[in-house]
Amino acid sequence: MDQLIQLVEASEARNDFPAINPGDTVKIQLKVIEGEKERLQAFEGVVISDRGAGGSKTITVRKISHGVGVERIIPVNSPNIESITVLKHGKARRAKLFYLRKRTGKAALKVKARKVVEKA
C-alpha cells in the first residue's frame, strides 16, 4: 500500500520550482477562475512556514496589504500555481517565523538577507 501511495505522489510532484525556505520573499502566480474566464493573480510576501513533504507540502506566505496582515496557505504541488519566483533569500534561525505576526509596519517583513552560492 505504501508503495502505491509513493508512486502516485511521485507522479503528481512538481519539480519545476526553486528551493523555498522560511524567510524567503517569494512571488507566486496563481490561476484564478472567475466564471468562464481565467486570469493570473500575484501574491508576494515572506514565507513564514513550510510544512509536509512530497505531494502534501504547503507553505504559508504573509504580506501586509493596506496595513492589514494577510496570510495564505499554498499547496506547493497545486495545479493552480503557474510559477513561484524567489525575490530575496532570507536568513532565518527558526523553522517557523510566527513572531512576524506581532510586528507592525516595515518591521513585519524584515528578515536578514542570506547570501546564496549557486552550485554549477
Swiss-Prot record:
<comment type="similarity">
    <text>Belongs to the bacterial ribosomal protein bL19 family.</text>
</comment>
<dbReference type="InterPro" id="IPR001857">
    <property type="entry name" value="Ribosomal_bL19"/>
</dbReference>
<dbReference type="InterPro" id="IPR008991">
    <property type="entry name" value="Translation_prot_SH3-like_sf"/>
</dbReference>
<protein>
    <recommendedName>
        <fullName>Large ribosomal subunit protein bL19</fullName>
    </recommendedName>
</protein>
<dbReference type="GO" id="GO:0003735">
    <property type="term" value="F:structural constituent of ribosome"/>
</dbReference>
<keyword id="KW-0687">Ribonucleoprotein</keyword>
<dbReference type="Pfam" id="PF01245">
    <property type="entry name" value="Ribosomal_L19"/>
</dbReference>
<comment type="function">
    <text>This protein is located at the 30S-50S ribosomal subunit interface and may play a role in the structure and function of the aminoacyl-tRNA binding site.</text>
</comment>
<dbReference type="InterPro" id="IPR018257">
    <property type="entry name" value="Ribosomal_bL19_CS"/>
</dbReference>
<dbReference type="InterPro" id="IPR038657">
    <property type="entry name" value="Ribosomal_bL19_sf"/>
</dbReference>
<keyword id="KW-0689">Ribosomal protein</keyword>
<dbReference type="GO" id="GO:0006412">
    <property type="term" value="P:translation"/>
</dbReference>
<dbReference type="GO" id="GO:0022625">
    <property type="term" value="C:cytosolic large ribosomal subunit"/>
</dbReference>
